[in-house]
């Protein structure tokens, strides 16, 4: 069970809604993933249409929506987008994203911290997408963010946990949930994140661009479950030395 602010989730896998070939495929994949929290870019939704092709299926699926501010380049733009999302969707939950460079899509730490503090004051449950910077994550926690979402690698890159060393520090010092966001390309990456102590992962591109998104979503569901179970089982310590699993000399003594 995962708790963030005032909500609890059975699944430790969060999913996105971008890059799917169709709205139906998106919904089918989300259902196969078992995800209960789904991010939604406000710039992709036509709020003037009561039956928006993306929003309506998600509402019918019964998932918790996490609108994001993707596309915002400054704190001011992100705050404005957040206010629109709250008014339109009736939710105070928000994934804060501020990335001014469209080529790399790396989060702006200064603008993110600035916006996070203000949005918390305005009553939002803020989950900020941020770099894998332990100092920044602690500062975001201190201004009242309900969780932190450090990247594993650049958005959509499928590179995996390139920031592993920093993620381990963030997880060790955090007192709020840590959600590894961005860069997760295959199910084994998700397993590794959960094994190291992350509370959840957010996956979009790896599922959406797969030849079979529904099958890949199911694979990620199983991978996340495996990671959670492995962590709960408490793995043995690593060692540079070998450790025999069977007696090395007993049979010689019997023969003698």
UniProtKB/Swiss-Prot annotation:
Subcellular location: Cytoplasm
Pathways per UniProt: Cofactor biosynthesis; thiamine diphosphate biosynthesis
Keywords recorded for this protein, A-Z: Cytoplasm, Schiff base, Thiamine biosynthesis, Transferase
Binding, 1-deoxy-D-xylulose 5-phosphate: 156, 182-183, 204-205
One GO term of the biological process aspect: thiamine diphosphate biosynthetic process
Pfam families membership: ThiG
Active-site feature positions: 95
Reaction catalysis annotation: [ThiS sulfur-carrier protein]-C-terminal-Gly-aminoethanethioate + 2-iminoacetate + 1-deoxy-D-xylulose 5-phosphate = [ThiS sulfur-carrier protein]-C-terminal Gly-Gly + 2-[(2R,5Z)-2-carboxy-4-methylthiazol-5(2H)-ylidene]ethyl phosphate + 2 H2O + H(+)
InterPro entries registered for this protein in UniProt: Aldolase_TIM, Thiazole_synthase_ThiG, ThiG
Broad EC category: transferase
CDD domains from the UniProt entry: ThiG
Family the UniProt entry places it in: Belongs to the ThiG family.
PANTHER family: THIAZOLE SYNTHASE (PTHR34266:SF2)
Function: Catalyzes the rearrangement of 1-deoxy-D-xylulose 5-phosphate (DXP) to produce the thiazole phosphate moiety of thiamine. Sulfur is provided by the thiocarboxylate moiety of the carrier protein ThiS. In vitro, sulfur can be provided by H(2)S.
Protein name: Thiazole synthase
Gene behind the chain: thiG
């Amino acid at each position: 069970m995962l708790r963030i602010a005032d909500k609890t989730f059975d699944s430790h896998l969060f999913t996105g809604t971008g890059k799917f070939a169709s709205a139906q495929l998106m919904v089918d994949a989300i259902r196969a993933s078992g995800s209960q929290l789904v991010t939604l870019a406000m710039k992709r939704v036509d709020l003037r249409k009561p039956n928006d092709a993306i929003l309506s299926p998600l509402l019918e699926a019964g998932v918790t929506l996490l609108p994001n501010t993707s596309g915002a380049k400054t704190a001011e733009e992100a705050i404005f987008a957040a206010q629109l999302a709250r008014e339109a969707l009736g939710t105070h939950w928000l994934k804060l994203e501020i990335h001014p460079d469209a080529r790399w899509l790396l989060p702006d730490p200064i603008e993110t911290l600035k916006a996070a503090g203000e949005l918390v004051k305005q009553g939002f449950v803020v989950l900020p997408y941020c770099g894998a910077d332990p100092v920044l994550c602690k500062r975001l926690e201190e201004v009242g963010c309900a969780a932190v979402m450090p990247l594993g690698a650049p958005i959509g890159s499928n590179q995996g946990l390139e920031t592993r060393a920093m993620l381990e520090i963030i997880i060790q010092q955090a007192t709020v949930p840590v959600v590894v966001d961005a860069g997760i390309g295959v199910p084994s990456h998700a397993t590794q994140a959960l094994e190291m102590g992350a509370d959840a992962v957010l996956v979009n591109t790896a599922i959406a661009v797969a030849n079979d998104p529904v099958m890949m979503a199911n694979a990620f569901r199983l991978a996340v479950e495996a990671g959670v179970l492995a962590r709960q089982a408490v793995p043995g310590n690593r060692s540079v030395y070998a450790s025999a699993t069977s007696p090395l000399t007993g049979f010689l003594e019997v023969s003698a």
